UniProtKB/Swiss-Prot annotation:
It is found in: Cell membrane. It comes from Bacillus cereus (strain G9842). It is a single-pass membrane protein. The keyword Glycosyltransferase does not apply. The gene is kdpC. GO terms for cellular component: plasma membrane. Keywords: ATP-binding, Cell membrane, Ion transport, Membrane, Nucleotide-binding, Potassium, Potassium transport, Transmembrane, Transmembrane helix, Transport. The system is composed of three essential subunits: KdpA, KdpB and KdpC. Belongs to the KdpC family. This is Potassium-transporting ATPase KdpC subunit. HAMAP family: KdpC (MF_00276). Part of the high-affinity ATP-driven potassium transport (or Kdp) system, which catalyzes the hydrolysis of ATP coupled with the electrogenic transport of potassium into the cytoplasm. This subunit acts as a catalytic chaperone that increases the ATP-binding affinity of the ATP-hydrolyzing subunit KdpB by the formation of a transient KdpB/KdpC/ATP ternary complex. One of its GO terms (molecular function) is P-type potassium transmembrane transporter activity.
Length: 193
């Protein structure tokens, strides 16, 4: 019996010590460092409106249905973060073809002036997460005609807006140039006022 207690005692102490270290101390230290070094990222990269209200995150896309605004990628989960993920069909899957055809049909309804052959792939296909907040600068540019007609904002102004909101590859190496749709639409909204 004494032998069991002598073995159990250090096991309980070690378990309790690691529980406190890994479950309390480590998370508090990491959170403190994150808040001190990169507060914006640690808080979720939130985007605020003029009234200082949170309207979204630059990391999670939103669905814009008003044709006066730029539209992002297709999302099979309607940009619901709790349902992150997408039906990543194989190129040989007929369901992928149906989904892309449906996206193209919806695109044609709002963008009659743009030939389907000029529609960038990111406007008719899902991202892996279904939450992608960015589109390519080309995907933003093909929407300029529609937005210009509906808002009476010149194409030159809209193209400059896209250029101003275009972000380069991460660290100059990873990924491609991209435009955050929410941030772009916020700048567009300022012009609409």
């Amino acid at each position: 019996m004494e032998k069991k207690q002598s073995i159990l005692s250090p096991i309980i102490r070690i378990t309790f010590t690691f529980l406190v270290l890994c479950g309390l101390v480590y998370p508090l230290i990491v959170t403190g460092i994150a808040q001190a070094v990169m507060k914006d990222n640690a808080d979720g990269s939130l985007i605020y409106n003029d009234k200082n209200e949170v309207i979204g995150s630059k990391l999670i896309g939103q669905n814009f249905t008003d044709p006066r605004y730029f539209q992002g990628r297709v999302s099979s989960i309607e940009y619901k973060a709790e349902a992150s993920g997408s039906n990543n069909y194989a190129p040989s899957n007929p369901d992928l073809e149906k989904r892309v055809e449906k996206s193209i049909e919806e695109w044609k309804k709002q963008n009659r002036a743009v030939p389907v052959t000029e529609v960038p792939i990111d406007l008719v296909t899902n991202s892996g997460s279904g939450l992608d907040p960015d589109i390519s600068p080309q995907a933003a540019s093909v929407q300029v005609d529609r937005i210009s007609k509906l808002t009476n904002i010149t194409k030159e102004t809209l193209n400059q807006l896209i250029k101003d909101q275009t972000e380069g590859a991460a660290l100059g190496l990873f990924g491609e140039n991209r435009v955050n749709v929410l941030k772009l639409n916020l700048e567009l909204q300022k012009l609409l006022k």
